[in-house]
Swiss-Prot record:
Reaction catalyzed: oxaloacetate + phosphate = phosphoenolpyruvate + hydrogencarbonate
Assigned keywords, A-Z: Allosteric enzyme, Carbon dioxide fixation, Cytoplasm, Lyase, Magnesium, Phosphoprotein, Photosynthesis
Protein name: Phosphoenolpyruvate carboxylase 2
Pathway participation: Photosynthesis; C3 acid pathway
EC number: 4.1.1.31
Modified residues (Phosphoserine): S13
Primary residence: cytoplasm
Primary gene name: PEP4
């Protein structure tokens, strides 16, 4: 190694640098700095080996200047950092942006390992009293004990509630997962190395080998192109989503249900959760969500369903042989013996395409005889799906396959009953029970696919039909006229149109989607969701189209209400729908309604949206009760706070009383899928949190808010909406300011998802999707959509009457919904930094718009001050020291990336902005004559100067990784 320069001696240890940022350990079991320092040391050594001392020194120097800015908030440090970064040549700036982005990903991994470690320590001590984690964690065992011991529920009541509840997790491919799958897999291996390195019984040789493996994985991740060079298709998104089933969810579900059995035993229930209790269900939108995504065609939907069926049978095939090995007994019930004898006589000779049990199973192994028949059918099911997927037809007859889940469950149930009857229930409750639980959870289709479409598209189809029938234009009819016609057709029998109906491409697309639903087995599908739904006719239209396209088992139709006005009108719309006799008979006492968090937030700001969503749920439940209907709420939450995200447990427990009632559907979007299911322990924790919180909310609902709290919040919401809209929609130059002050215009280059970032190509904030709107403000660490409106609302009620402060503090302490709303905004303030937003303004915003930026930053500071007053906190996050520590450790990297991004945007947007470049720093060690210039060649088609586009995208990804709430 080269001798250390004077600068490097000051920075001899990254460990010391990290400790400078964080004032001491948070607790005895706090190893975060240790983990962080180890990963960064290894990375910096790799950087030095690959690119030389100068570049490593530059990265550390940037880090040091940024750390000084973070501790002293001296704006000159940002200028100093800017000069250092802009003097880099294109290749170097890409390598440095990539290094910082990589360091943030490593910091995330260190943090995940620390969280899991703390959890294990806590479980060993049997101690759940740690306030910080108790608020956001919910252990199923802890919840059951609390319900029985503290809340005096009887164990039988708890068991009954638990086995009848359902949590349906809906995976959606929202364009927010900004890390490539190739990297996610490497991250997973880094995480595993780190866990093993710190385990107690590790030998010196193990340690050495693990350290080598760790370095290998860190280097492999660094050498992988972080940027997606092509936009993913819906099929890519589906395959990415399905990979989580393969890797964690498939085995995670039975493992979790065993833990539930153990927790029940500990409160005195000696029964297991029945294998067919629908505790956890999975659905998906990948390949079914066509709202604003023209790339999701009927063919895509068909492919995705066949692919999921193929994957499900493949997973069962891979496990059935383990079960055949386990069930080698000869004792069995007469019922099973008779079945086995019949099968034994009818089976063919050998099956050479199997590795195990390829010879005919002897009759004295009756369970294996039964299971080998199941295996044949699973094999045929998989091969038939594979052939249909690749060529559109299959020679395997359908009767040789499994067409519904009963055909798979029935022989397994027979084995289970027989084992129990022969005194072998201990064996029955092993692998066989796990298998039965998997079949009950995943069925033959792995997940149920929801279809989502805009209501307008259905109106177009019906308009074409009524015009074709010569009875007028459906689009022009009043709501009453529409309902009358739809109901008369639904009550009648005649087909509405033939093949000669004149169709545009859009109309064909809608009808062909219904034909795909009719053609495929009904267990492939879940709900049909109508976005932008406003009236009963929107729902009836889908019912009629399902009938016209011969859907034998119609999908349940779910209206989605998302804008503020739609949420306000939703209860009345639902009441009108329930008062239609035909519809009430059709739904059989069950209805689902989806509420959208993203668009309501974009439309009115976070405070008003959160309160309106709360009230809408209360009203909708009331309407459903009046009509004797069980209502399931489907929550369309994003990963970020601006789009309704936040800790799961808190989010569920802060819902209004009576709104969950043991059935909950919730979306798991984009990057949240990786955070929830990326590892076995994360998957376990996710299933546990949802199950425990749903049970607790049902059995111990939160207090209903006092009338005076409601009145105060009503008043605040009006002021907040007014303030939010006066800036976002009414300030004439706001859109121009937004486009200049953030990287919104450049966002589309990230190739995150298959969906366009705008609903309409031109247009203002209205047409912009909620994700890029939030993403852009997150990048500049200003988070405007989250906090805007809160300050004005607080100020208004405090100026009216200072006693309102006491009431707000009482609401914060006693009302979970209000507390969660405030805490999440506080967390966003802790991640925000108006100084960084000011840098973007200084570099990118035209002079005459500077006052608008200054006004918004003053508003930010004032809102933060008022929020702390309401929460009764002196500093941000004083109640959550762990989170505070984690954020401090990341700040310096994120700041460097912010500065790099702001200056890169300046160079992209202003051709007259010239910088003095220093000579190359980076040396490719393999060939010392070659600088890092090669990385510039990865993007030959860029319309910008060399290297700028990649540097920009790398900063976006790095900041997203650092703030962990992408869009």
């Amino acid at each position: 190694m080269a001798a250390l320069g004077p600068k490097m001696e000051r920075l001899s240890s990254i460990d010391a640098q990290l400790r400078m940022l964080v004032p001491g350990k948070v607790s005895e079991d706090d190893k975060l700095i240790e983990y962080d320092a180890l990963l960064l040391d290894r990375f910096l050594d790799i950087l030095q080996d690959l690119h030389g001392d100068d570049l490593k020194e530059m990265v550390q120097e940037c880090y040091e200047v940024a750390a000084e800015y973070e501790t002293k908030h001296d704006l000159q440090k940002l200028d100093e950092l800017g000069k250092m970064i802009t003097s880099l040549d294109p290749g170097d700036s890409i390598v440095i942006a990539k290094s910082l982005s990589h360091m943030l990903n490593l910091a995330n991994l260190a943090e995940e390992v620390q969280i899991a470690y703390r959890r294990r320590i806590k479980l060993k001590k049997g101690d759940f009293a740690d306030e910080n984690s108790a608020i956001t964690e919910s252990d199923i065992e802890e919840t059951l004990k609390r319900l029985v011991v503290d809340l005096k529920k009887s164990p039988a009541e708890v068991f009954d509630a638990l086995k009848s509840q359902t949590v349906d997790l809906v995976l959606t491919a929202h364009p927010t997962q900004s890390v490539r799958r190739s990297l996610l897999q490497k991250h997973s291996r880094i995480r595993n190395c780190l866990v093993q390195l710190y385990s107690k019984d590790i030998t010196p040789d193990d340690k050495q080998e693990l350290d080598e493996a760790l370095q290998r994985e860190i280097q492999a991740a660094f050498r992988t192109d972080e940027i997606r060079r092509t936009q993913p298709t819906p099929q890519d998104e589906m395959r990415a989503g399905m990979s989580y089933f393969h890797e964690t969810i498939w085995k995670g579900v039975p493992k979790f249900l065993r833990r539930v059995d153990t927790a029940l035993k500990n409160i005195g229930i000696n029964e297991r959760v029945p294998y067919n209790a629908p505790l956890i269900q999975f659905s998906s939108w990948m390949g079914g969500d066509r709202d604003g995504n023209p790339r999701v065609t009927p063919e895509v939907t068909r492919d995705v369903c066949l692919l999921a069926r193929m994957m499900a049978s493949n997973l069962y095939c891979s496990q059935i042989e383990d079960l055949m090995f386990e069930l080698s007994m000869w004792r069995c019930s007469d019922e099973l013996r008779m079945r086995a004898d019949v099968l034994h006589l009818s089976t063919k000779k050998d099956a050479k395409h199997y590795i195990e049990f390829w010879k005919k199973v002897p009759p004295n192994e009756p369970y294996r005889v039964i299971l080998s028949d199941v295996r044949d059918k699973l094999y045929n099911t998989r091969e038939r799906s594979r052939e249909l997927l690749s060529s559109g037809h299959s020679d395997i007859p359908e009767e040789a396959t499994l067409t519904n889940v009963e055909q798979l469950l029935e022989p397994l149930e027979l084995c289970y009953r027989s084992l129990c009857a022969c005194g072998d229930s201990v064996i029955a409750d092993g692998t066989l029970l796990d298998f039965l639980r998997q079949v009950s959870t995943f069925g033959l289709s792995l997940v149920r696919l929801d279809i989502r479409q805009e209501s307008d598209r259905h109106t177009d189809v019906l308009d074409a039909i009524t015009t074709y029938l010569g009875i007028g234009s459906y689009r022009e009819w009043t709501e009453e006229r529409r309902q009358e016609w739809l109901l008369s057709e639904l009550n009648g029998k005649r087909p509405l149109f033939g093949s000669d109906l004149p169709k545009t491409e859009e109309i064909s697309d809608v009808l062909d989607t219904f034909h795909v639903i009719a053609e495929l087995p009904s267990d492939n599908f879940g709900a049909y969701i109508i976005s932008m739904a406003t009236a009963p006719s929107d729902v009836l239209a889908v019912e009629l189209l399902q009938r016209e396209c011969h859907v034998k088992t119609p999908l349940r139709v779910v209206p989605l209400f998302e804008k503020l006005a739609d949420l306000e009108a939703a209860p009345a719309a639902l009441a009108r729908l329930f008062s239609i006799d035909w519809y009430r008979q059709r739904i059989n006492g069950k209805q689902e309604v989806m509420i959208g968090y993203s668009d309501s937030g974009k439309d009115a700001g976070r405070l008003s949206a959160a309160w309106q969503l709360y009230k809408a749920q209360e009203e909708l439940i009331k309407v459903a009760k009046d009509f004797g209907v069980k209502l399931t709420m489907f929550h369309g939450r994003g990963g970020t706070v601006g789009r309704g995200g936040g800790p799961t447990h808190l989010a569920i427990l802060s819902q209004p009383p009576d709104t969950i009632h043991g059935s909950l559907r919730v979306t798991v979007q984009g990057e949240v899928i990786e955070q929830s299911f990326g590892e076995e322990h994360l998957c376990f924790r996710t299933l546990q949190r949802f199950t425990a919180a749903t049970l607790e909310h049902g059995m111990h609902p939160p207090n209903a808010p006092k009338p005076e709290w409601r009145a105060l919040l009503d008043e605040m919401a009006v002021v907040a909406t007014e303030e939010y809209r006066s800036i976002v929609f009414k300030e004439p130059r706001f859109v121009e300011y937004f486009r200049l002050a953030t990287p919104e215009t450049e966002y589309g280059r990230m190739n995150i998802g298959s969906r366009p970032s705008k609903r309409k190509p031109s247009g203002g904030i209205d047409s912009l999707r909620a994700i890029p709107w939030i993403f852009a403000w997150t990048q500049t660490r200003f988070h405007l959509p989250v906090w805007l409106g809160f300050g004005a609302a607080f100020k208004n009620v405090l100026q009216k009457d200072i006693r309102n402060l006491h009431m707000l503090q009482e609401m914060y302490n006693e009302w979970p919904f209000f507390r969660v709303t405030i805490d999440l905004v506080e967390m966003v303030f802790a991640k925000g930094n108006p100084g960084i937003a000011a840098l973007y303004d200084k570099l990118l915003v035209s002079e005459e718009l500077h006052p608008l930026g200054e006004k918004l930053r003053a508003n930010y500071e004032e809102t933060q001050k008022l929020l702390l007053q309401v929460a009764g906190h002196r500093d941000l996050l004083e109640g959550d020291l762990y989170l505070k520590q984690r954020l401090r450790l990341r700040d310096a990297y994120i700041t460097t990336l912010n500065v790099c991004q702001a200056y890169t945007l300046k160079r992209i947007r202003d051709p007259d902005y010239h910088v003095a470049l220093r000579p190359h720093l980076s040396k490719e060690i393999m060939d010392s004559t070659k600088a890092a210039a090669d990385v510039v060649k990865l993007n030959p088609g860029s319309e910008y100067a060399p290297g700028l586009e990649d540097t920009l995208i790398l900063t976006m990804k790095g900041i997203a990784a650092g703030l962990q709430n992408t869009g």
